[in-house]
C-alpha cells in the first residue's frame, strides 16, 4: 500500500433526479414528484459516434457513455497513458431493458425476430466495455454488479487498485 491519494477529477450523472451534476443536485434537494421516477428527455445519440451505435446499446450503456462523457469533459486532458487508464462501473443489473424487449419479441414474433445483439447489449459489463473502447483505455475494465451497492463497490475497487500500484 502506498501513500498515493485518490482524487475524483470529473463527475457525470444520468439519473431520475437530473442529467448532469447541477441538475442532479437540484433534483436531490427538491421535493420528489409523485409517480414514477424515470430518466426522461434523454437523447443518447449526442454521446455516440452515430445513431446506429446508440441504438445497438442498451439504455444502461447509453447512460454510462453519457456519464463518462460528462466526467471526461470536467476532467479535461488526461495525463495518464491509455494502458494505465481503466474503467470501473457499478450496475445493479445491466441491460435488463433489452432483455425484456427481446423476450416480448420472442413471445410475439418468434425466435427469428430476436436481435442478434441481445447478449452483447444485455451483459452487465457492456457499459464498462463501451466506455473503455470509446476512450481507448487499455487498463483495467471492471464491472461490479452488486445491486444498490454497485457504484460504491466500483469506487472502492478502483481506489484500491490506484493505491496498490
Task: List where the protein language model places each region.
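Short conserved active-site loop signatures built around small residues
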Residues: 151
Amino acid at each position: 500500500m502506498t501513500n498515493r491519494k485518490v482524487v475524483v477529477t470529473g463527475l457525470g450523472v444520468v439519473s431520475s433526479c437530473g442529467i448532469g451534476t447541477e441538475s442532479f443536485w437540484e433534483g436531490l434537494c427538491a421535493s420528489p414528484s409523485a409517480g414514477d421516477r424515470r430518466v426522461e428527455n434523454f437523447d443518447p445519440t449526442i454521446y455516440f459516434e452515430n445513431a446506429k451505435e446508440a441504438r445497438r446499446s442498451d439504455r444502461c450503456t447509453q447512460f454510462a457513455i453519457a456519464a463518462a462523457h460528462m466526467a471526461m469533459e470536467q476532467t479535461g486532458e488526461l495525463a495518464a497513458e491509455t494502458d494505465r487508464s481503466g474503467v470501473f462501473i457499478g450496475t445493479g443489473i445491466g441491460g435488463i431493458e433489452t432483455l425484456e424487449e427481446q423476450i416480448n419479441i420472442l413471445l410475439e414474433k418468434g425466435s427469428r425476430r430476436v436481435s442478434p445483439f441481445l447478449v452483447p447489449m444485455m451483459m452487465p459489463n457492456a457499459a464498462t466495455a463501451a466506455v473503455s473502447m470509446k476512450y481507448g483505455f487499455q487498463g483495467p475494465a471492471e464491472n461490479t454488479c452488486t445491486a444498490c451497492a454497485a457504484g460504491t463497490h466500483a469506487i472502492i475497487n478502483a481506489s484500491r487498485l490506484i493505491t496498490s500500484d
